[in-house]
Swiss-Prot record:
InterPro entries for this protein: Aldolase_TIM, BATS_dom, Biotin_synth/BioAB, Biotin_synthase, Elp3/MiaA/NifB-like_rSAM, rSAM
Class of this enzyme: transferase
Keyword flag RNA-binding: no
Lineage of the organism: Bacteria, Bacillati, Cyanobacteriota, Cyanophyceae, Synechococcales
Catalytically driven reaction(s): (4R,5S)-dethiobiotin + (sulfur carrier)-SH + 2 reduced [2Fe-2S]-[ferredoxin] + 2 S-adenosyl-L-methionine = (sulfur carrier)-H + biotin + 2 5'-deoxyadenosine + 2 L-methionine + 2 oxidized [2Fe-2S]-[ferredoxin]
Protein name: Biotin synthase
Family designation: Belongs to the radical SAM superfamily. Biotin synthase family.
Record-listed [4Fe-4S] cluster binding positions: C61, C65, C68
Binding site for [2Fe-2S] cluster: C105, C137, C197, R269
The entry's keywords: 2Fe-2S, 4Fe-4S, Biotin biosynthesis, Iron, Iron-sulfur, Metal-binding, S-adenosyl-L-methionine, Transferase
The Radical SAM core domain, residue ranges: 46-274
One GO-annotated biological process of the protein: biotin biosynthetic process
PANTHER family named in the record: BIOTIN SYNTHASE (PTHR22976), BIOTIN SYNTHASE, MITOCHONDRIAL (PTHR22976:SF2)
Summary of subunit composition and partner proteins: Homodimer.
Length: 335
């Protein structure tokens, strides 16, 4: 049982070990949530960032990620489409802002960023989103040092590149890109001065040891990732994991709480699979550390709760969101 008077979690650390993370992950749930909530209140207000995610280029990806319907190895019925034009993407960003989002995330189904017109358009999209007064995030696979610097010059807020799972379990999920490839991409992003957005997926068939190992890699990054998306598998027909079972909501709550304890200042983003969580489960995730969600009716290729439902949920709970709303002006006391 956690002793609230000890100093075990009083400092931000970058030297977590797998065994101690696994111990935290397996704490009695009430104790785990309580400790995570204390840390959440200490380092963050109860404010939830609303991030909108848009697929700029869908399908045709050369990677063989077994959970993804955008892979050329998938037999899913997803409709591929070429890259949207800059104006169309910025119009979508304007709509997202009107609906309450303050971060606009743009996704390309690529193994790596492609130079020439596609990359030039990406730069214009980043600049346009920033001109709207929004944070701009890109996820587009691997990138070069030069590309990272150009994105930084364009004002990119964050670059997303998830680790997906533990180093040990990774080969069961994807074989066309190594774990080290992912770490090198994150290093290039960080060296360019761009915030790192990096998380993973639970429900891929991994065990708690793998989840602890994933969190070990994330929490030992110095500094910690600016944002950490925690996804649960959405099993899509035609993918390698189409028969995957829906995880119990308690597993997501444990993952969110542990991530908050390990990375006190990061945005812990409740991401894909949230539609499968009950309202009560989402509330518990907010209570123990989630402070960002993807906002809007769909993600890249999966559905998501409607923005009307999300705004009602956040207001009913008393969670703050988006600085542009008067509702966010009230302060939250700390304990």
């Amino acid at each position: 049982m956690i002793n609230s008077d000890n100093q075990k979690f009083s400092e931000i650390r970058f030297d977590w070990e797998r065994d101690e993370i696994l111990e935290i992950l397996n704490y009695p749930l009430i104790d785990l949530m309580w400790e995570a909530q204390i840390i959440h209140r200490r380092f963050n207000q109860y404010k939830v960032q609303l991030a909108s995610l848009f697929s700029v280029k869908t399908g045709g990806c050369e990677e063989n990620c077994s959970y993804c319907s955008q892979s050329i190895y998938s037999s899913s019925q997803i409709k591929s489409h070429p890259q949207f034009e800059v104006e169309a993407v910025l119009n979508r960003a304007k709509t997202a802002k009107k609906e309450g989002a303050d971060r606009f995330c743009m996704g390309w189904a690529w193994r790596e960023i492609r130079d020439g017109k596609p990359f030039n358009s990406m730069i214009e999209m980043v600049k346009g989103v920033k001109e709207l007064g929004m944070e701009a995030c890109v996820t587009a696979g691997m990138l070069t040092d030069e590309q990272a610097l150009k994105l930084a010059d364009a004002g990119l807020t964050a670059y997303n590149h998830n680790l997906d799972t533990s180093p040990e379990y990774y080969k069961n999920i994807i074989t066309t890109r190594t774990y080290q490839d992912r770490l090198e991409t994150i290093k290039r992003v960080r060296n360019a001065g761009i915030n790192v957005c990096c998380g993973g997926i639970i429900g891929l068939g991994e065990d708690n040891g793998d989840r602890a190992s994933l969190l070990e890699v994330l929490s030992n990054m110095n500094p910690h990732p600016e944002s950490v998306p925690i996804n649960s598998l959405v099993a899509i027909e035609g993918t390698g994991l189409e028969g995957g079972k829906e995880i119990d909501s308690i597993e997501m709550i444990r993952m969110i709480a542990t991530a908050r304890i390990l990375m006190p200042k990061s945005k812990i983003r409740l991401s894909a699979g949230r539609e499968n969580l009950t309202k009560e489960a989402q509330i518990l995730c907010f209570q123990c550390g989630a402070n960002s969600i993807f906002y809007g009716d769909e993600l890249l290729t999966t559905s998501n709760p409607s923005f009307q439902d999300d705004r009602k949920l956040l207001k009913d709970v008393g969670v703050l969101f988006n600085k542009d709303f008067e509702y966010c002006d009230k302060t939250v006391s700390t304990v």
